[in-house]
Amino acid sequence: MAEPIVARDIAIVIPALNEALRIRDVVEGALAQCPNVILIDDGSDDETVERVADLPITVIRHVQRMGKGAGLRDGFAEAMRRGFRGVISMDGDGQHSADDIPRLIDAANAYPEHIVIGARLRKRARQPTYRRIANEFGDWGIAWGCGFRIADTQSGQRFYPATVCALGDIPGEDFVYEAQLLISASRMLGVRCVSIPIESRYQAATGPVKFRKSHFRPLRDLWRITSHVVGQVLAYGNVLAEYRRTRATPAIIHDPTGEFTATAGLPQTRTG
């Protein structure tokens, strides 16, 4: 049996595009949990890199914008080159809390060779309505492509085992790439997903914490994700049978304290 994964066994990969507002807080929070942080600067034209220049991290710079998918690919490649057992991805805008990193690792040990998703289930009513609707619609399509239900397919805070990081030739860019990673891991490796409840932070009308405007564009990006996933579903065939199988396979929530099941309802959700 493999030794449990600990923080030094993984890398934190942070794709960043014009994140000068929050990037230092994000990186310092990640370093407090894990000594191995890889920042992918996607052609930023602000002071993103300068804000963290004195911190003990690896920085990979794109001279021009290549998209989040390219950033994740480069981060995965660097992590695999250095022999890490997995990668935790998190966004550079501060919406993900580094305090959830130990819980992601705990779930990775409870469910070996699973992708672990930080699912935005806590205080979900605070999520902007347009984002919540887009996420729920995307969840349906991506789950169909994978063959099983998933809680929050579009969260950027995830643990990927090394076997998934090493997958080559994954199509798609930006948010489409993250969706395709789940589908390819399922179809090519038989890897399932498990989710842990997290709270994602959003810009409030008032308050001291500021975030930059999201790079996610609901109509544009949802269309790109949906059209791509539909193409994948059709390519795999047996569309109705796959739909029935997906509906019959509940999402997995790693919730050892019972926090989520006591407060929110996915009645078909399995907890671990």
Predicted regions and their residues:
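Hydrophobic helical membrane-anchoring modules
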Residues: 1-7, 147, 171-272
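N-proximal low-complexity "stem/linker" segments adjacent to membrane-targeting elements
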Residues: 1-29
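Short beta-strand/loop segment that forms part of the nucleotide-sugar
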Residues: 14, 27, 35-44, 60, ...
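Acidic helix N-cap motif at the loop->helix transition within catalytic regions
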Residues: 21-25, 46-54
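Short, structured coil segments at secondary-structure junctions
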Residues: 33, 54-56, 189
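A conserved acidic beta->alpha catalytic loop
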Residues: 41-50, 94
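Acceptor/aglycone-binding surface of glycosyltransferases and processive sugar-polymer synthases
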Residues: 63-66, 70-81, 98-175, 203-216, ...
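Short beta-strand-to-loop acidic/aromatic patch adjacent to the donor-nucleotide binding site
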Residues: 84-95
